[in-house]
Amino acid sequence: MPRKAREYPEEGEFVVATVKRIHNYGAFLELDEYPGKEAFMHISEVASTWVRNIRDYLKEGQKVVAKVIRVDPRKGHIDLSLRRVTQQQRKAKLQEFKRAQKAENLLRLAAEKLGKDFEAAWREVWVPLEEEWGEVYAAFEDAAKDGIEVLKGHVPDEWLPVLKEIVENYVEVPTVTIDAEFEITVPKPNGVEIIKEALIRARDRANKEKDIEVKFTYQGAPRYRIDITAPDYYKAEEVLEDIAEEILRVIKQAGGEATLLRKEKRIRKVKKRKK
């Protein structure tokens, strides 16, 4: 079970918790990411509507995503709320938790290869990476994308070779793909060749950038679709803007017209394994 580097959660933090004991006035929950820490959820924090029977909402052994509303480390008190968690926040937290589980499994594998126990791995790798990146899997993603050198100085050097092997084989680099259409016309006998050359030049120039992939698809005159895959949305938009400027410039010089068409900003998230 993945655990946080901190001893106590912070107010406003979302946590994964397991219901341990239920009473008429509230419930006690164990914090999955903070071993040995128990929290209390008053019945008024279970749901937005009046709760007649708390057992209609909570069951022993049930895992929930809750929001930390009060923390008193001196007394060891932690208060949680279920009603203050939106569906989107719940989904995001569960995704984060799954990523932490993946990171833990990978670190256990690395520790086994290095002949170390997980407690040593947690102290030497997990804690410093979480403190620097916020989550360990994000550090592994950066290492898969930019090279293991990004971890140098954060973890002992003896871990780098085995972590390099792990991230290259098991960590996928997240990417996004956006699409748009160009409407292009060149009223000349060789207009088709001019358009083709403009698209090829724009595509090849963009594809020279690291982790960028651009593809054009003929949609039927005068429309051409473009798909851009990049590490993140902002980079994809930047590439689209550069390509649009280049195409518009070349087509205008040739005496034609080009327009970028975007009815809406559509983003398709994909994951591409690093090769």
UniProtKB/Swiss-Prot annotation:
Superkingdom classification of source: Archaea
GO molecular function, one term: RNA binding
Occurrences of domain S1 motif (ranges): 12-83
Keyword Protein biosynthesis: yes
Record SMART domains: S1
Keywords from the named record: Initiation factor, Protein biosynthesis, RNA-binding
Function statement: eIF-2 functions in the early steps of protein synthesis by forming a ternary complex with GTP and initiator tRNA.
Family designation: Belongs to the eIF-2-alpha family.
Subunit-level organization: Heterotrimer composed of an alpha, a beta and a gamma chain.
Protein known as: Translation initiation factor 2 subunit alpha
Organism: Pyrococcus horikoshii (strain ATCC 700860 / DSM 12428 / JCM 9974 / NBRC 100139 / OT-3)
